[in-house]
Amino acid sequence: MRTIRIGSGAGYSGDRIEPAVELAEKGDIQYLVFECLGERTVALAQQARMKDPDAGFDPLLEERMRAVLRLCAAKGIKIVTNMGAANPVAAARKTAEIAKSLGLSSLKIAAVIGDDVLDDCKDGDLRIMEFDGSIKQLGNRLLSANAYLGAAPMAEALSGGADIVITGRASDPALFLAPMIHAFGWAMDDWNLLGQGTVAGHLLECAGQITGGYFADPGYKDVADLARLGFPIGEVGEDGSLVITKVAGSGGAVTAQTCKEQLLYEVHDPKQYIQPDVVADFSQVKIEEIARDRVRVSGGRGTKRTDTLKVSVGYVDSYIGEGQISYAGPGALARGRLALEIVRERLKLTGVASSELRFELIGVDALHGAEVSAHANEPYEVRVRVAGRTENLREAVRIGNEVETLYTNGPAAGGGAFKSARDVVAVASVLLPRELARPQVRFVEA
């Protein structure tokens, strides 16, 4: 039975680069996938593209490509990535430019476009899933609308001879499913194979999470050599059989526990994990360790895909103003609390208009609140943080300014003040009839 090995080279935009190089050097892989596109990332990329039509792709695209292109070209490893973000064509052109500069003139690069459905959405009455409202009501605050594409156009690009496939918004598992469809000729209505392939993609998509990164918890779940964490490899058979592993000798661990945690990551209903290509069913998945750092995963199934695609909508929601300052030594906690009370009163006295305010001591009550931390030992040092949501930038700036004035206006011995004000790019979701997303493949020669 034919088997392919797919390496996961990144789990988010800013992920480490050397584990991907290790996969290309030592992983005996045929495909290297970089999953770099978070939910808000494409909206932020769209903002960048509005300022510069040649921008809008992943900021680390050049660094990643320069690190792996020679290796991948020499070994025949194909690259699949969503680093195209809001501008896959520009990303493909940039990659061709990089390849040429490295003396790799024969690489074939494909850009998958069609996820940008802003024009199809902005004047419609599509209902927002997270709150009561429609996309039309966002008005000029709307920045982007990108449909989650499936594996088919990426598989088409691979079948067309692409060495590198660059897409924008696509479902994360689809990046891994595409090589399986291409390599094995899976039918796009073989729901059980697509379901099992989606299990594989879901397990691999976050890179170092499944090899122990997100799993590690000292004293409870110890993982060795996290500074050299190896990224995962999926060995996939044409029948959908799957083994998760990593490069021998790399840091981290692949165990039944790490795989089970990742299987449940971001899953609301294990029986209906809705993807563009299939509704995957994880409920009968079986996970078993077969050797050190080798875990067999079976039992993924699927049913017919939906008639709609999820669309990630980016919009300017509000503004956030923030200020921080530190206190240390005897009485630090009391001084920190006094600082919060001073700022709270100052914001009232000066009439700062906000819709939401947070007053917290980092390391004391910032994460779980004052009730949970009430009985903890008093810390030697604290960091005051005040943040507020406002309707305009001017009011947001005033919040940080008030924290900064604690330097000279008390309490005693504050230091390391920081302030910022920024717009908040939020994301929401709508469902779009599938036929309104029209993916296309465009080839670029290096």
Where are these regions (language model features)?
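A conserved active-site cap/scaffold subdomain adjacent to cofactor or substrate pockets
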Residues: 194-299
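N-terminal amphipathic/basic leader segments beginning at the initiator methionine
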Residues: 1-22
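Gly-rich Lys/Arg/Thr-decorated short loops/hinges at beta-loop-alpha junctions or inter-strand turns
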Residues: 1-2, 39-55, 73, 117-141
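Active-site glycine-rich loop that binds ribose-phosphate moieties when present
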Residues: 144-158
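C-terminal non-catalytic interaction/assembly regions of soluble proteins
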Residues: 299-446
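Flexible, glycine/charged-enriched surface loops at secondary-structure junctions
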Residues: 105-109, 210-222, 270-289, 346-362, ...
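N-terminal glycine-rich anion-binding loops that anchor highly charged ligand groups
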Residues: 27-45, 70
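Catalytic or ion-translocation cores adjacent to nucleophile or general acid/base/metal-coordination motifs
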Residues: 100-117, 177-218
